[in-house]
């Protein structure tokens, strides 16, 4: 695994529009962190509800998908197309890179949520509910980051549908309708987030192997890269 990860990090430097993609990744991560901190200040006033509880986390999780995008774009190169690296890039290396990036993102979100919950004990339950949503989103994004390069339109429709479903679940959770079993203990909430990360990583690897022979979707890449497909 370590060998694959080192090669993946070397390869992403040669991805399509690498500098611009890294810049966008940093912007998403920074915006997500700022939104998380702003959300905390709103929660202190007792005004935050709905998607405001997790929008910062969504931005942070989105930033974790960009390295995988760069990695898979390297498989468009002619030399890679004719080498044994192509399958590894689109399957095991992509799944491992996504797992690492998602782990980093989830750990940062958990850190922010736990720090806030420890400082403001009365809001700990609110933060743990948000971690439950984070776990659902990390599972969804993990699978999306594999399927999108093969079935672009279908994957967009799927992520929109399930994002709306998570929003409905959050409204049910925050509206006081959910049974107590859904309001997890802090350790269980953290464990759930990491558990969904692991489940998503395993499923994404299996899916990547299942759809490997499917041609990459032109719509999933910019115009310059699409011409190489």
Located regions from the model:
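Short helix-to-coil transition segments within interhelical loops
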Residues: 81-87
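Hydrophobic alpha-helical transmembrane segments of membrane proteins
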Residues: 1-77, 92-229
